[in-house]
């Protein structure tokens, strides 16, 4: 007797499987070899699954001891709390005599780009759900202090449009940029991606949304040469365009931060000055066909106490109902630095929760959105494997 899978056309089976959440399908793959073959080595199908499946939105934290943990928030009741789950350890670092100490993480649709301020000779792109990794050598550069971002563009394949990934490497506050192509396994220098007087040294934060990278930048528009705006880098054109903020003529913010909402919108945290409310804005739409066309909606305006200091590099994200926001910041007390998460709602009541370890050294702790996916990491030359 034929199994159900054998009785159904492959196209229909694929369509059904593409509706199953990634974590559930991951378990099913281990019990059905035929279903496992549908996804193993098929980047197009894995990408199609990400576009059509129900998303499972999770949270991750990078602690100041260079370790990544899933984190869950309990926002019900009168005492909000958080819980750190088991540490995520990529296979290479777990078995290596010299572990890779991650100090910066960028999330891009289920993939994590991890870099280290202690070892800038390499970065790793990692899918925590599947365990797949790709280590990339970054070469010898003039000085330390580089940042790396990941994104993609679509290119035509024999069967469909597929995502092709790239890395962007840069020194903040300079005009030096390089780009890495996953398929060709090569780096090259980029010129003129920002305005002559522009700078992305304003903040260390960046986020990835729909394949593009966003930063805070200064001096990137001719009309407002000294003001702060958002800058979007397009990995297809390899150019950047300014994206106007809700406040378009500011030379300085008391606090500013970036986040992504449910993988389809940008969110910014802005505080104009020390006496102003802390505002959370979310994009309604970002017009991909015109330069910087965007509209914003203010979803929260918080009147925080002066002792709660939010800087330009602290991370945050919104709760699903956009009524609660979580900030991650450092609390400096004498000779100790502790990572804190502040949970704040519309009532302005602040819940402080410490996590991580008390250390003066270490990386900046962050919290970030994460969506488990079966997206496969592009190998050099298409499907060819290569060593690390």
Curated annotation (Swiss-Prot):
Residues 2-48 form the F-box domain. InterPro entries: F-box-assoc_dom_typ1, F-box-assoc_interact_dom, F-box-like_dom_sf, F-box_dom, Gal_Oxase/kelch_b-propeller, SCF_F-box_component. SUPFAM superfamilies: F-box domain, Galactose oxidase, central domain. CDD domains: F-box_AtFBW1-like. Coiled coil: none annotated. Induction: Ethylene treatment has no effect on RNA, but down-regulates the protein levels. Disruption phenotype: No visible phenotype, probably due to the redundancy with ETP1. It comes from the Eukaryota. Negative regulator of EIN2 protein stability. Double knock-down mutants of ETP1 and ETP2 show an accumulation of EIN2 protein and a constitutive ethylene response. Interacts with EIN2 (via C-terminus). This is F-box protein ETP2.
């Amino acid at each position: 007797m034929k199994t159900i899978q054998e009785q159904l056309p492959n196209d229909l089976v694929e369509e059904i499987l593409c509706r199953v959440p990634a974590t559930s399908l991951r378990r099913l793959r281990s019990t059905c070899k035929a279903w496992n073959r549908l996804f193993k080595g098929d980047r197009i199908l894995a990408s199609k699954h990400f576009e059509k499946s129900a998303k499972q939105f999770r949270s991750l934290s990078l602690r100041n001891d260079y370790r990544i943990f899933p984190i869950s928030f309990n926002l019900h009741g009168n005492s909000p709390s958080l819980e750190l789950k088991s540490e995520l350890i990529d296979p290479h670092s777990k078995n290596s005599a010299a572990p890779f100490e991650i100090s910066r993480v960028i999330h891009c649709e289920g993939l994590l780009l991890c870099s280290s301020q202690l070892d800038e000779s390499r970065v790793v792109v990692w899918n925590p759900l599947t365990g797949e990794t790709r280590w990339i050598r970054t070469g010898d550069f003039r000085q330390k202090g580089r940042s790396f971002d990941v994104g993609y563009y679509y290119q035509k394949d024999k069967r469909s449009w597929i995502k092709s990934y790239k890395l962007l490497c840069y020194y903040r506050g300079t005009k030096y940029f390089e780009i890495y192509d996953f398929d060709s396994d090569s780096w090259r220098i980029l010129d003129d991606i920002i305005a002559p007087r522009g700078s992305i040294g304003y903040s260390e934060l960046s986020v990835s949304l729909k394949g593009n990278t966003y930063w805070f930048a200064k001096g990137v528009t001719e009309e407002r040469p000294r003001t702060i705006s958002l800058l979007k880098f397009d990995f297809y054109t390899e150019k950047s365009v300014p994206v106007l903020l809700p406040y378009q003529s500011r030379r300085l913010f008391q606090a500013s931060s970036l986040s992504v909402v449910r993988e389809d919108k940008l969110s910014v945290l802005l505080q104009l000055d020390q006496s102003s409310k802390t505002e959370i804005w979310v994009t309604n739409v970002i017009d991909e066909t015109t330069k910087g066309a965007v509209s914003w909606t203010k979803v929260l305006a918080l009147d925080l106490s002066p002792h709660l200091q939010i800087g330009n590099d602290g991370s945050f994200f919104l709760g699903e109902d956009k009524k609660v926001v979580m900030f991650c910041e450092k609390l400096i007390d004498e000779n100790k630095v502790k990572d804190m998460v502040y949970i704040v709602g519309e009532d302005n009541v602040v819940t402080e929760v410490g996590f991580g370890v008390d250390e003066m050294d270490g990386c900046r702790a962050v919290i970030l959105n994460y969506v488990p996916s079966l997206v496969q990491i592009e190998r050099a030359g298409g499907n060819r494997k290569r060593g690390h």
